[in-house]
């Protein structure tokens, strides 16, 4: 559900790309300079520490790691923004269920890997936003959140993944 809320916020921006602004002073300077509205999204880093990202535009090249996140985006009609999806555990039948429930949206996704991808494969898709579970942002998978941030790519770690938050409240 949190992923759905994040995507709704992104949709409300009405732009085509995302931007990273690392601190409050830089964010205020950008608002003053451009007059653009920013949307703050609270997420986590690789070490499960809270962090914020600020979006000025809708991500247009989203890389998705995990079937549940893919399903949420497809349910919101965002298949055309997804450049690739890495679905681990595809043998569980989750992919088949997604394929049957959202066939038109799934057709818009250029590449879906039934096995996990690595960082080099993710880089090849030139994403501007990566959504996944905390376990995807390790050196052995896609690399750390800071690695992507240094390259101008926003990341979103679902709070419900890999015990990032023990308990949560949706407001």
Regions found by a protein language model. Name each.
Residues 64-125, 129-137:
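A short, structured surface patch at a secondary-structure boundary
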């Amino acid at each position: 559900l949190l992923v759905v809320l994040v995507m709704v916020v992104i949709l409300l921006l009405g732009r085509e790309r995302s931007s990273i602004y690392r601190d409050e002073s830089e964010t205020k300077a950008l608002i003053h300079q451009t007059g653009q509205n920013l949307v703050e999204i609270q997420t986590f880093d690789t070490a499960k520490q809270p962090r914020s990202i600020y979006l000025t535009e809708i991500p247009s090249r989203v890389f998705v790691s995990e079937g549940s996140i893919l399903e949420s985006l497809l349910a919101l009609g965002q298949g055309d923004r997804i450049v690739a999806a890495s679905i681990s555990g595809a043998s569980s039948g989750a992919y088949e269920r997604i394929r049957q429930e959202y066939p038109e949206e799934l057709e818009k996704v250029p590449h879906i890997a039934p096995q996990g991808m690595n960082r080099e494969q993710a880089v090849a898709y030139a994403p501007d936003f990566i959504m996944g579970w905390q376990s995807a942002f390790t050196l052995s998978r896609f690399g750390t959140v800071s690695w992507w941030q240094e390259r101008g790519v926003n990341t979103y770690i679902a709070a419900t993944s890999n015990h990032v938050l023990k308990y949560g409240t949706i407001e």
